[in-house]
Amino acid sequence: SGVSGQSGLTLDLEAKVEIGELAYFDDGKGIALQGVRLSSAADPAQLAKYHLELDILAAGDLSLTFKSENVSRFEIEEIRFVDTPGLTPITSDPSIGGIFIDYDIEGSLLSYNRGNSYIGPNNVLGGVYDLEFTITNGKLGYRTNGNEFLLDGMTLDVSSLGMIFGVTPAGELNLSMPNLLAELSVEAIRFSSNPLNHGVSNDVTTGDPLASYGSLWVNMDLNTDLRIKAGGADGLTGM
């Protein structure tokens, strides 16, 4: 990575991340994300590259802009139900498959300087943010038993202005997005039964394009409010 600064701070980041397992447990039962990886999409052995710029504006607001320097891949190889964390996975253990996303992202996050007063209709102690980003050259895939379902040629535009994130007086974690706009387009919805194929548009054995179920376009304008309350590690409530 490289760091420079004059008007704010510029960070060029190159990363290859591998996490064996992340697990969440409640009442002695857990769900584990195994084989979590971040790398270049073209070659898993290569690095994902990003350019970040951080600046404090005149009003005291914090501005972060971010941009990919290559197409990156974030992958969870297996999602399993487990009793004990950290054990070597057995192929017969219950699994719901794995997911991955390839993306080239560019966007910005603005954190407003609002002091320590309560915010919004839920009287949250936290922050107000504007988030905007665009994903291009995207692929979103689900994989299980050598079969793969793929959203190919994905573009996603997201704008969430006036987003509130913090804690309510009742101790609930609150994420409020009163102005969430999103537009998703997918060039082809593909399926592969060849276990050698992974995140590709053409079959690696035959070279033929993978079967497509057509394209997809979605436009959303949402007002959402999410509150999460902790119910304890034991008992019926959980989270």
Give the positions of each predicted feature.
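Low-complexity repetitive segments in secreted/extracellular proteins
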Residues: S1-T10
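Intrinsically disordered, low-complexity polar regions and short flexible loop motifs
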Residues: D12-M239
